[in-house]
Amino acid sequence: MLQSIMDIVADIMKQVATGDNLSQISKSVGGDEKGVQSALSMGIPMLLGSMSDTTSKPGGADMITGMLGQMGGSNPMDNLGSFLGSPTSSTGGSSMVSSLLGSQMVPIQNAISQKSGLPPAIVGKVLAIAAPMVMGYVGKMFAGQKMDQKGLTSLIGDQSKMAMQSSPDAANMAKQMLGSQQETAKATGFFKKIFGK
């Protein structure tokens, strides 16, 4: 049975809070622990939402499976301490975040910055660490399963909505950004997809 992404969000946050993991992340990105924890709790659902939007587009599922392939079957959460201690822990994550969020990357960083109190640049570093964690978990979910486009799109789409429901701050932030985009007549499908609109 595939594991719920909502459970994955909770599990990531639980493991981050274990031992000195949160301290390691905070030192790595140069932010305070409270702000980093807040940024992660909002950033992870937003990354899942972007994955949902990506898989719904032509070629999007192939892009996600390609990212999963780059992980080589590894899951940072299997040994979080070792992953965080690696000097390259966020290197691959930066390209993942850029590919997933695209033009929405800066608005999302700014929105999380306002909520968490961290500078946007620090939020970007937090997302770069979070992305491999999320991708590793998605890969783990499909271990031994047939990962076709329909299955990937359906699972991530449904579970990204559940992840948003588990994070009111992220959901409110996304709704505010959707409203802002609609007002300026530049709305994309990114946030609409998250809320099934």
Q: Where do the PLM segments sit?
A:
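A structural "flexibility-hinge" signal
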Residues: 1-197
